Amino acid sequence: MKEAISYVDINSSDAPIGAIIVDDENKIISRARNNTEHDPSGHAEVLAIRQAVDTLGVKKLYNCSIYITLEPCPMCATLISYTRLKNLYYGARDLKFGAVESNVKIFESNLSLFKPNIYSGILENECLELLKNHFANKRL
C-alpha cells in the first residue's frame, strides 16, 4: 500500500488515488494514479489493470493482487471481478461511491462473476489524509 500511496500525484487536480498490481511473488506489475482529466474511465484501478494485462499478455489476472488507496467504485469493482484479481487490498472506505463495503457491494451481487479476497483499512489513516488534504486545498 505504501507504493500506491507514494505514486499518488498530490499536485494533480484529479483525486489522489493510487493503485498497484503485484504478482504472487509481490513483484510490481503495474502502477497507476487517477487520470480522469480527458478520460472519465481513467481511474487508477482501470489504468493499472490495463497496464497489467498488456504487460503480462493475458486477459485474466488470476495470481495477482491489487492495492488501492480508496475503496473501488462500481465500475472498478466490476472490472476487478471480470479480470479475476485474486486479492483486493484498499485503504480508505468511500462512503459515497464505494462498491465493496460501503454502498452497492458489487461482489455480493449477481453482477459479480468472481469475488476476490478482500482486505480493507490498509494504512487507512494515510490514505484518508491524502483525500482530506486534496479536498481542503480545492476549497481554498
Please state what every model-predicted region is:
Residues 1-140:
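Zinc-dependent deaminase catalytic domain
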